[in-house]
């Protein structure tokens, strides 16, 4: 009988192979089947929108207990709490909350809105690109949907665009955070690959922009085909045309990004620094420019950091426990062995898997973090680089979430437009599928 060593779980030693030969791998097969059932149960609960962190942690602990190695789950949890990406994710969200507190995000959005109103025929693609730009600076899909949607959706509806199409245009641009160094997935992949976070963004930015252009073109074409680009009058809609944009306030949200880009490209060598340092500098400059109470701004910054630890780092910790459970059951080794024997499916798994999970759960984070921690470190075995595979998984999960009817950002824009979230998904489905295909072509070849 041929045994694939890669399929053996951690609890089997080299000598354990003898036992497997004597008892034709019944124990191994039982553990693999049990592990698969637990994973499927976890996926079912995620689809049913149970608390993602609870589901992942519980599933990981159960798998570790079943394998006879309960401490592996706790060790993974403890290890994750000291993760190097905490500073990037937390400082980024702290800065985003500081921008909301000072109102600088509104100045940036209104500045973009005034430009869009001057070119009426570019309203829909312009809103998509504008929302994307806002999301680059403020890396929260739901936060961007709320901030940008409150301005852009009324502008589009006031110009005669169908409410559902207006909401879909904003939602289509809510994955600009892929280009933000503070997005947790970027430093996560960078850490695995042993490279700088800006190196990861430099690798996938062309794919992101290409996917955005394709998505914007397809959605605009759908709007023209359905005749939803004009002629839909909404009574009682009033735009805040009196809002006065302060150019300095509007520039504040992009200060950290500008510092990081100028430093990483060595255009201004003194600006070469980490994400956390850039975010703190941005917050300090914002405090000076807006003359905000320093104590109040500091509180909002740290409130954002705490929210990031609970929401973003929490999912990373939970995904680590889940992966520890899969490792203990032998699922990861079996999966890697299967892909090693069929390398042609790896690129499909890396993108389509997180995309589908993002679509059906409303969040691509859990699936993407789990995939990147379990499989991406072995990218070289499949003829891919770690950054390449990690970027494919991240973009796939992000686009799936952008298309999902149960994502927080979808629900927010639908509420602003006064329509059903499914109406947003119906219009965004085809653009996001095309965006994924083009994006993956850029990353895979």
Where are these regions (language model features)?
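Hydrophobic alpha-helical transmembrane segments of multi-pass integral membrane proteins
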Residues: 88-91, 118-153, 316-319, 341-377, ...
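Core transmembrane alpha-helical segments of multi-pass membrane transporters/permeases
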Residues: 54, 73-106, 276-280, 284-331, ...
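Membrane-core helix-loop-helix motifs of multi-pass transport proteins
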Residues: 153-248, 409-445
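Long, contiguous bundles of hydrophobic transmembrane helices that form the permeation core
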Residues: 15, 22-39, 56, 62-67, ...
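Membrane-interfacial loop-to-helix junctions in multi-pass transporters
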Residues: 29-33, 81-86, 112-129, 158-166, ...
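Short helix-coil transition sites and intra-membrane helix breaks within transmembrane domains
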Residues: 48-52, 83-85, 97-106, 135-147, ...
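Re-entrant/interfacial helical elements at transmembrane boundaries that shape
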Residues: 107-110, 142-155, 183-194, 365-378, ...
């Amino acid at each position: 009988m041929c045994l694939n060593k890669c399929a053996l779980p951690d609890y089997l030693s080299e000598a354990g192979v003898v036992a497997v030969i004597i008892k034709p791998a019944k124990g191994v097969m039982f553990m693999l089947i049990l592990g698969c059932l637990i994973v499927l149960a976890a996926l079912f609960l995620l689809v049913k929108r149970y608390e993602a962190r609870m589901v992942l942690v519980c599933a990981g602990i159960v798998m570790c207990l079943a394998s006879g190695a309960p401490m592996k789950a706790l060790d993974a949890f403890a290890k994750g709490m000291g993760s190097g990406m905490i500073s990037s994710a937390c400082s980024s969200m702290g800065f985003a909350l500081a921008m909301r507190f000072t109102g600088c995000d509104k100045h940036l959005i209104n500045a973009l809105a005034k430009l869009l109103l001057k070119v009426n025929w570019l309203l829909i693609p312009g809103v998509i690109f504008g929302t994307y730009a806002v999301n680059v600076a403020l890396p929260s899909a739901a936060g961007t949907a709320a901030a940008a949607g409150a301005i852009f959706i009324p502008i589009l509806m006031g110009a005669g665009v169908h409410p559902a199409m207006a909401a879909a245009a904003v939602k289509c641009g809510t994955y600009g955070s892929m280009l933000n160094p503070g997005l947790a997935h970027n430093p996560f992949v960078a850490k695995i690959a042993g490279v700088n976070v800006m190196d990861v963004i430099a690798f996938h930015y062309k794919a992101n922009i290409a996917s955005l252009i394709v998505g914007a073109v397809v959605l605009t074409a759908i709007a023209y085909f359905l005749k939803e680009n004009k002629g839909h009058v909404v009574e009682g809609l009033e735009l805040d045309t009196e809002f006065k944009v302060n150019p300095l306030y509007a520039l504040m949200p992009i200060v950290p990004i500008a510092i990081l880009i100028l430093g990483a490209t060595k255009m201004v060598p003194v600006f070469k620094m980490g994400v956390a340092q850039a975010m703190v500098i941005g917050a300090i400059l914002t405090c000076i420019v807006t003359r905000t109470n320093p104590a109040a701004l500091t509180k909002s910054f740290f409130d954002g950091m705490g929210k990031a630890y609970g929401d973003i780092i929490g999912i990373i910790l939970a995904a680590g426990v889940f992966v520890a459970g899969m490792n203990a059951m032998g699922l990861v080794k079996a999966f890697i062995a299967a892909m090693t024997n069929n390398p042609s499916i790896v690129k499909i798994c890396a993108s389509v898997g997180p995309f589908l999970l993002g679509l059906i759960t409303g969040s691509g984070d859990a699936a993407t973090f789990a995939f990147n921690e379990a499989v991406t470190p072995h990218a070289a075995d499949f003829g891919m680089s770690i950054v390449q595979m990690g970027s494919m998984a991240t973009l796939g999960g992000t686009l799936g979430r952008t298309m999902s009817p149960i994502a927080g950002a979808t629900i927010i824009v639908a509420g602003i437009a006064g329509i059903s979230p499914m109406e947003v998904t119906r219009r965004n489905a085809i653009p996001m599928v095309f965006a994924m295909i083009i994006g993956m072509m850029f990353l895979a070849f």
